[in-house]
Amino acid sequence: MRTLTRGPVAAAVLAITLAGCSFTPSIVQRAMDDDPDQLLAQAAQQQGAEAAQTRLRAADILARSGRRPQALEVLNSLDDSQLSGDSRRQWALLLSELGDSEGDPQAVVRAASVLDEMQLPNDEANLLRLRQGLALGQLGEPLESARLLMQVQSATGREDINDAIWDQLSALNGRQLEALEEPGNAIVTGWLELTRLVNQSGGDIQRLFARLDDWRVANPDHPANRRLPTQITQLRELRGKSVQSIAVLLPESGPLSGVADAIEKGIRSHQANVVNGGGNGAQLSFFDASNGNLDELYQQAQSSGAQVVIGPLDKSDVTRLESRAEVPLPTLALNYGQSASNQTKNLYEYGLSAEDEARQAARRGWQDGHRSASMLVPDNDWGQRVGEAFWNTWSELGGDIATAVRYNPGASATDSTRRAISNPRPDMLFLLALPDFARQVPPTLEYYSASDLPVYATSHLYEGTPQSRLDRDLDGVQFPDIPWNIPDAAVGGAEALPFYDTYQELKAENKPAIFRLMAMGVDAYELARRMPQIQALPGSRMQGATGTLSAAGDGRIYRELPWAQFSSGVPAPVFSDGLGDAAP
């Protein structure tokens, strides 16, 4: 989950808060000599509405006296259903303010629930919607966040939330952008056109700004025309810095040569389609990395005139690069090194990591309101690595592990599944399994009267092509996968996929396992083309064949994957509500 940059956003919230001072209720004018601790003790002896009103008064005094964390705790524990209309309005405004300032987005979302239940003055309603939109962005729900922020802008015309709106829109895929369309709303339409324009420009900055000029002519009164998002204006500085030459370091022999061949095919096919489509296609030079002599490979890359390097692929080679202070050329390695984090200057790391999927499963389960998880992973090195990734992320979020079961991949799933759901009964199951084993798990859950237990898996249970008869037993199981593998669930159909021409060419003739690696090659080429943008604008996103890609602070490329849920044996769309219903 990516947290919003708080600079301009905080300023926007502050401005609206100050503008709303005229409607601040009388609780902020109460006598300053009231003792909040005595009020809380008094509330403990009271019941119902009287206790809720006393706690609200105490929380207000705590907040104004600088004891904001305690004030937030009091408001979170308060039964707001016991408050009268005006007091409940005051509770919502104060809780949302404290939740925003104290880093508790769930509290903000709870406060904003009053918008569905009571009529508020416009200024107050817009303030709550703004805070709710920002909170949902922090909770990893860019679709609803963008919807609310654009609603606020449509009502107020504010331009100082443009960066917040752009931050959320740039995280959305084609299907999600379509879901935001509001015919007749010029602000929403303009934002969606701008987002698609940037997404379709690739790494060609000149092409982007030529199209941007056309957009500005067509949208003269749009808030983003008057004040372009900061990330877009910063791209102006990259004009004339496009990548013209890329060196690719892949092994031509050895155990990774088959993987390298698939990645190379993806790179070459996409480069040809970019050129054929009139884009700025960088020249490619391929060098055999089988011998692992990294210094020699960099010398060859520099001699070829390369501006960016793709590779190496071998994990040990990437780990060796991580031991250096700097690499000679900006480098997109095709694996992750073994260091806890990458600190090498100019080194970026990208791959299709099962550990990443496990972390996303943990975050999604938490966002969906689950707090106790069981794990069912294979008893091998792969299961240990991926299982640890889920366990660590789940624990960091505050979740409990009810049971962790390591199973024999060659055995029946019956006993291991039974043990995974035995006492204490979890409220979700994390499953790491290949298709044959995974298909046994839901029927076993049904046998043990646990068919309603949510199951979150990784993409490894899906073979990559719809097989309704074989996969019907997986109905209800949720899993993330690359957009190119689940086009209907990811973007509403193959035609809306990123790099559709390349997708058509590669999908027609290749097995699913090879197809994933080719998709990785496509995104590697696109990331290399955009290297100046990645370096200049940390956190900028790309809608790719393998997910929504962005570079973390340590140069590792983070993939946010779309989710699918088996329905009648085929992957179907599924959306997280992002709000949950459990206590933090």
Residue ranges of model-derived segments:
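C-terminal motif of bacterial Sec signal peptides marking the signal peptidase cleavage site
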Residues: 17-20
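Bacterial signal peptide processing site
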Residues: 22-25
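Alpha-helical protein-protein interaction scaffolds
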Residues: 33-232
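Beta-alpha junction/loop-to-helix N-cap segments that form part of ligand/metal-binding clefts
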Residues: 258-265, 277-339
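Short beta-strand elements at the ligand-binding edges of bilobed clamshell
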Residues: 339-363, 471-483
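An alpha-beta-alpha
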Residues: 347-406
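Extracellular/periplasmic periplasmic-binding protein-like sensory domains
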Residues: 426, 442-520
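Segments of small-molecule ligand-sensing domains
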Residues: 504-573
